[in-house]
């Protein structure tokens, strides 16, 4: 028996086959969600004819939102593998045999840190991932980035986001330039 998730679009109900969904982590919100994943186990796009045959309900939904999908990247989607392909693929290349520390890019208002290991269906929507071979290395990195010294370093080396309160985000460059004190 097939399982389905329900998705609404323009007040119409669509069924989405659960086999085409993956778990995705949005670390900035410390939230796990489901996402349509039109790729095979090797992260290759599922061809449209195969998609429509194997996942007909999901395909109906994707066809319904096609105009919106084609507006992504200011309409410059001609280099996408297919009209339903993801524009960015950084979060698709996760090695489930490694230890991962996923952190939000913003120090405030909530700096979220999530540890992950052995989850085959793990995808990343936002944040940075530290990938380690051992749990010990992961714990060392976690300990360092949670220190007040790291937070102070980011505040000194980054520009704040404007708003009611200044929020600081950090980049890969900040991480690479951070000196660990032993």
How would you name each of these model-derived features?
Residues 1-182:
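Polybasic, glycine- and aromatic-enriched phosphate-binding surface used to engage nucleic acids
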